[in-house]
């Protein structure tokens, strides 16, 4: 029989949520320091990557089976899946509209968007997440739309334009945002006790 390969990225099981998480961004910054003057030179490379560790709640084997099947299907670090910050699934800002990218070929840490209600304040607040195409960004400053419903939004990390093209009128997601991740380890392990309660955790990094 032919080998079966799942269609990646996979979607998380919904049988349970996450109990705890450690979620953050890892950067590649080189620092050299003179041994004589202690003066430093700093260079920020393009590499920036979301990383996370998720611990699931204790669960019975029927629920655990769905999670284990999902994790097995990733085949270690081979497969990918969609996930985001599980504690920040909605924004703090006032935006409710369909928001679009305003202009193609945008790069760096700022992106022009439109579709906001004209002159609306705090459409996004610092710390909100937005998703453009497959990737996740955090808004780094409060955003107010101008009289045309347009705004420049400052984000971290830089736009992933070297990985995915960001086209004009691309829809911007700001609820249940995710990025694409893969497991950090090729080993999959879990804990059980005498009453078949399972403990499952996994670590992952953004797929770039």
Indicate where each model-derived feature is located.
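Extracellular/virion structural assembly segments
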Residues: 1-208
């Amino acid at each position: 029989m032919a080998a079966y390969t799942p269609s990646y990225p996979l979607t998380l099981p919904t049988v349970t949520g996450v109990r705890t998480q450690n979620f953050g961004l890892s950067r590649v910054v080189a620092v050299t320091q003179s041994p004589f003057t202690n003066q430093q030179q700093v260079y920020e490379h393009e590499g920036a990557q979301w990383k996370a560790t998720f611990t699931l709640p204790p669960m019975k084997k029927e629920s655990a089976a769905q999670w284990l099947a999902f994790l097995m299907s990733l085949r270690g670090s081979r497969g990918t899946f969609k996930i985001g910050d599980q504690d920040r699934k909605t924004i703090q800002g006032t935006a409710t509209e369909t928001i679009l990218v305003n202009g193609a070929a945008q790069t760096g840490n700022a992106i022009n968007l439109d579709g906001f209600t004209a002159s609306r304040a705090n459409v996004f607040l610092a710390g909100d997440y937005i998703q453009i195409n497959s990737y996740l960004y955090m808004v780094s400053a409060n955003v107010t739309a101008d009289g045309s419903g347009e705004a420049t939004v400052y984000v971290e990390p830089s736009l992933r334009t070297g990985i995915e093209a960001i086209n004009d009128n691309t829809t911007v997601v700001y609820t249940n945002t995710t990025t694409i991740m893969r497991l950090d380890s090729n080993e999959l392990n879990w804990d059980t006790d005498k009453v078949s309660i399972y403990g499952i955790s996994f670590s992952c990094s953004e797929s770039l």
